[in-house]
Amino acid sequence: MSRLTKSENYGYRDINNIIDTLCGKYACLEKFEAGKSVAGRSINAVRLSYGQTYTLFAAAFHGSEHITGNICLMFLEELAEAYENGGSLEGINIRRALEGRGVIFVPRVNPDGCEIALFGASAAGSRAGEITKQCGGDFSHWNSNLRGIDINHNFDADFAGLKKREAEEGIFTAGKGRFGGSRPESEPETVALVSLCKKENIHHVCAMHTQGEVIYWGYKEHCVSRNKQMAKILAATSGYALNTPVGASFGGGFKDWFVSYFDRPGFTVEFGRGRNPLDTAKALEIYLKAREMLTVCAIL
């Protein structure tokens, strides 16, 4: 197939143009707005088929990890192609495998942060001066939203413990990343995902990050057996390692909240290897290595 999604940097408008084109091409796809960012940018979601339950793929929580949006859209495109035409992906007949089920994609959870990481101060509006100072002029490593809150530390999962660990690591104020804010769900991007999960019957989630080729699975005592079983399958189909987060990386995350709130499986997948931000030119290479895992994750 001729790929619409390329291995190149995509701004907010580019991402939405790709989503609109895909939804126009494939009748099985439907775009809807999950919420809005601090700057008022739409946090768009795409539904592939209506079902009794859904698998949710969410990408680009962190600005410097905007490549995960490319990977997410590459997978969405191929999955829709196979579903629409009764075809297979990684040897699996997608329409048959998803009978009674659907998949929801959120390719860019943090559109403001991605714009800052890609385009610098011009994307930061009235906060341009403050953000320039916070990141020392190197915008490419910006992970937070427009207010300097790390979205993946802003969910209501052991938030008190997260704040304690932040303090131990000297993280006290808003900045380019790792600060979870003063309270959970203080940010509209966080609220958008929480609302989406509460509205739809999400069976399990895959939070897409970079880097390390690692799968973080489960959270505390919740859904341990099912989580572990699924994690082993995802690892076997990708070659990625299984691990658990430590320090200020533990708690406050989307996967942590989903698993603890619903007692259902959730995974944080760190795609690719290297140092963030990964070279967007490698998006297709990273996607192809992970495609079997993503396909299996969609249908488990």
Regions found by a protein language model. Name each.
Residues T21-F32:
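A domain-start/cap signature at the N-terminus of enzymes
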Residues K31-A34, G86-I94, N243-G247:
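Surface-exposed patches in mature extracellular/periplasmic domains of secreted proteins
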